[in-house]
Amino acid sequence: MNISDYKHLDNILLQVNKPARYTGGEFGSFRKYGCPLDMAISYPDLYEIGMSNTALKVLYNIFNGIEGVNCERVFAPAPDFEEKLREAGIPLYTLETGIPLKKLDIIAFTIGYELTGTNVLNIIDMGGIPLEADERGEDDPIVIAGGPGVTNPEPFGKIFDAIFIGEAEDAYEPLLEEVIVIKKRGGKRSDIIALFESKSFIWTRNKKEKVHRAIWSDFGKRVYPAARGPVPSIKAVQNNGVVEIMRGCPNGCRFCHAGIYYRPQREKDIPLILQEIDTLVHTYGYREITLLSLSSGDYSVMPRLITYLNQKYASYGVSFAFPSLKVSTFSLNLLSQLNEVRKSGLTFAVETPLPAWQADMNKTATMESIVEIIREAKKLGWRVAKFYFMIGLPVSGGGAAEEKEIVDFILRVYAQTKIQLNINVGTFVPKPHTPFQYAAQLTEEESWKKLSYIKDSLRGHPIKVSYHSPFLSYLEGLFSRGDCRAADLLIKAFKMGTRLDAWDEYSKLDVWKQVLAEADWNVKEEICRQRGTEEPLPWDNVSMGLSSSFYKNEWNKLGTNTFTSVCSPDCHHNCGICGTKTAVRNIDQNIQFPPLPPQEPIPESISRVYFIFAKKGESIFLGHLDLMGIMEKSIQRTGFFIEFSQGFNPKPRLEFAHPLSLGIVSEGEIASINIHGSCEPEDFVQKMNKCLPWGLEVKEAYVVSKETYKAKKIQSLMSLYSGSQYTLDYTGDDIEIFQTNLEKYIKENELKDYVGTQRNGNSFAFDIKAGNKKANMMAMLKEVLGTDYPLEQCRITRNRLMCSPAPGERLTYQDYFKTI
């Protein structure tokens, strides 16, 4: 059974918030049928978080690039959708073709954050799959996981059949090809699990051998599926294109798990970076590109690269941003380059304020450098700077009065810069496979005391203070360094109703506190205590490729003011990661960039393209703001030079005549876009239809020169709007009662001059004029049908939008466009 066989799903979607989370159909998504291996990939959080995850996009492209593999997506449902699905007995399904999860061969989770565990359980449970690996049978999918959040597999071992350790690019293709061979010869689920267990980079509960992280040694020098599509249909938390320019980090911060997980540092070749950016801009329609790495400013030729990119993409309104820059790699040149199109955030991850404490972390972020950078940034137009700090780091003297030192640092920065400051303070959580894996963690009470002091001390200043929940950090510590007992607590908490633990509006911290209190072991002591360097650790059977002596040596440098030099091709750390197959890889600093292609001159003339488009299928679940974002990216993909507004953040001059309510089909929505130069209407229609997601189709276009629409003083589309014509197909119980109630509503609200109706069998034609708030299709039907969900009893199509270019004149927009 496919999910389309469930007749009530459309009605359910119209009763939940952001239904497009659950419909798929995005531009760049795959729809493959008849493959021997059906699988799903999931980042276990809400759609807008999951679709921001770079690893998910990379894996999606890798898996779908393997012959014989169909990989679809599934995300955690919000509570409103979960409730409706459970009430209706509908299983959770994949987005691309609606496969119920239980019908899949494999479900793969990429885990970037430990507190998504209850989301994993909810996805599994809503798919009709047993929660624990030992309870699954031959008819159940294999449930696997990977990512930085499960490098200590023990707390999740009861849930996953297998856990992949390391980088996927080189390992998964041959692995899944072997799975397909097993399936084709009639092998069982247990045969596939045995295959997984035989791999050196896959952990299972029954495996005795040490597991070694898979490392893609060819990163940066070989083309591989990148973080491209699908393009989110609703606004994601990170709604930009991403190019990974460097993997790993040279800096060796002792608290940083990602720096170990992605070690060694490997820089991507310039031609590959340019190729990926071209694809993101011209094929996918992104105007904001993040140059991703753990420390982008350390990329060998960053100033030259950003200068080149700004020159190449200036005419397309494309801007570039970095997720992270070391204080030492900030420069006036980089700041000015970031200022070219739009300003990205000015962010400083200071972590701890005192130089001696920074030395304990193997990090430098001096106040003098920060103040100098902010002063220069203010001259270039920046108005806000963001700072990240951690409390509870294992620094010299035990971090005594660290909260006071943080306050003093911030006030001194503000006094010297007078810039708006946003401060985020988190509680340090020791991570496995790092030099600080042995450290103690603050209790929840200790964290609250320090955070309260910081917040109270900065009150009254133009300084915004936010913080990560101390209890969530406490809980994170349980799954970061816990053992197999943590899995029992996770499963119990899920069964008691916990979901989406990182979301303030959904988390049930009281339930978690009850679960921890009822445990038959001292959870608090286990989370917060310091570990001995010779003590067995739950993750000892997993190797990141670094020697245990390296971790211990780095830990023993605390309080000695000793820095470990950055990773480089000739470094002498002896950490153990570099060898015959893998090593630090820096590109040649004297590399010659390709000649800039001849810049296609942007025509000075401007044209306005009016276009009519249909909205059907999956697209009826898109809200108006999401539709605007989709159209913007789609037009960007066509290659037309879009006219942008002026100012701080340029926007396309895109306009819509009238928003359409969720769930209503349309045959003739109206919009316009200004472009440089001109085009043939047929060319615009053809190019747009190659660039739109499922359910949207441009049907007609009309091109008008700027001189014409200025001379004729053409009004905006919205100001011309004069109503809409609809068809309503009634599917409820008694059409006569419906018609009687409809006529009564029109009469009682004196809408005869605004609402015209004509019945034909079970269908009604509506002509609704603008000018009366009660003459609104959805509002009227809610009253007439006595329900908040009128589309359960009818299907509505908007056929035409009407306009009034002159008093007493009313015609379709199409007819009006023909007169311009």
Label every model-predicted segment.
Residues S605-I606, F621, L627, G732, ...:
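Core RNA-modification/binding signature centered on pseudouridine synthases
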Residues D10-A40, Y47-E48, S198-V242, M544-L558:
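N-terminal [4Fe-4S]-dependent radical SAM core
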